[in-house]
């Protein structure tokens, strides 16, 4: 596990080189939560209702905006307003995976207008380094307008059974993150990757990549489609800074109560990890 994982969110925020990661750690500390809720619902009303009800207990809301049947300006403006009201970030789980020219248009153009409202996006590096370079280039362009309020997570590992996001793929994810560290704030992975070394790159004292771990569920070990779950304690024990929970929260009989339970367990696991630091 990365030595930075042993530090408090406050300590990491105070020295973090990435402005959005700094803000995220500050939100987590202020609200005492490391929960990201994956709001995989299919209407704007459901999404905004969940965001409003769960907002006080989460650090991030994760969307799959293209599964909404009625995406519109109301969706964008509603999400932005609730993010401000409840002090959380928005993570669009678009998983960009195409040539650079295409992903630039998908991110900063098109009907979904992702760059306008999503603080965090993610990508797979299967197309190669160019996808990370292209997204970073877009975010640093003079006419971008959102600057340090946007960041990228590289999908370095997945929790689904038989995932091919392993080995050299994961190592290259870390290499690209180090090269484009001004825009890449961290990874979606099952563990801390800060100690990964290769012929291309090695850890530096100042780097502090944020780790989001998916597939966190208190009451289930998996589903029929290959998803493999772990608990908040096991995820954070392996190096997760933020836990991503979907059905365990939004499909619960009482989503608010479920979010509070994940908040409690996630925060206790974080406190246990940092000890007296």
UniProtKB/Swiss-Prot annotation:
Its EC number is 4.1.1.23. Pathway: Pyrimidine metabolism; UMP biosynthesis via de novo pathway; UMP from orotate: step 2/2. GO terms for cellular component: cytosol. Substrate binds at residues 40, 62-64, 93-102, 229, 247. Gene3D superfamilies: Aldolase class I (3.20.20.70). InterPro entries: Aldolase_TIM (IPR013785), OMPdecase (IPR014732), OMPdecase_AS (IPR018089), OMPdeCOase_dom (IPR001754), RibuloseP-bd_barrel (IPR011060). Pfam families: OMPdecase. One of its GO terms (biological process) is 'de novo' UMP biosynthetic process. Keywords: Decarboxylase, Lyase, Pyrimidine biosynthesis. It catalyses: orotidine 5'-phosphate + H(+) = UMP + CO2. The active site is at residue 95. Signal peptide: none annotated. One of its GO terms (molecular function) is orotidine-5'-phosphate decarboxylase activity. Belongs to the OMP decarboxylase family. PANTHER family: OROTIDINE 5'-PHOSPHATE DECARBOXYLASE (PTHR32119:SF2). This is Orotidine 5'-phosphate decarboxylase.
């Amino acid at each position: 596990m990365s030595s930075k994982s042993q530090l408090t969110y406050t300590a990491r925020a105070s020295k973090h080189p990435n402005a959005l990661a700094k803000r995220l750690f500050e939100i987590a500390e202020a609200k005492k939560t490391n929960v990201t809720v994956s709001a995989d619902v299919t209407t704007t009303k459901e999404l905004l209702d969940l965001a409003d009800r769960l907002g006080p207990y989460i650090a991030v809301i994760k969307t799959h905006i293209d599964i909404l049947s009625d995406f519109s300006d109301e969706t964008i403006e509603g999400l932005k307003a609730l993010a401000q009201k409840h002090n959380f970030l928005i993570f669009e789980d678009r998983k960009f995976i195409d040539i650079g020219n295409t992903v630039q248009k998908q991110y900063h153009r098109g009907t979904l207008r992702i760059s306008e409202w999503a603080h965090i996006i993610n990508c797979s590096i299967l197309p190669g380094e160019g996808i990370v370079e292209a997204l970073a280039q877009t975010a640093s362009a003079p006419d971008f307008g959102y600057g340090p309020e946007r960041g990228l997570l590289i999908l370095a590992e997945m929790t689904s059974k038989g995932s091919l996001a392993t080995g050299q793929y994961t190592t290259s994810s870390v290499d690209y993150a180090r090269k484009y560290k001004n825009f890449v704030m961290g990874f979606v992975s099952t563990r801390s990757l800060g100690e990964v070394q290769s012929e291309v790159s090695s850890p530096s004292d100042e780097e502090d990549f944020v780790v989001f771990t998916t597939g966190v569920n208190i009451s289930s070990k998996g589903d029929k489609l290959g998803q493999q779950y772990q608990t908040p304690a096991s995820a954070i024990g392996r190096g997760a800074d933020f836990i991503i929970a979907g059905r365990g929260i939004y499909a619960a009989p009482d989503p608010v109560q479920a979010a509070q339970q994940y908040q409690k367990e996630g925060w206790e696991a974080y406190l246990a990890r940092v000890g007296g630091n």
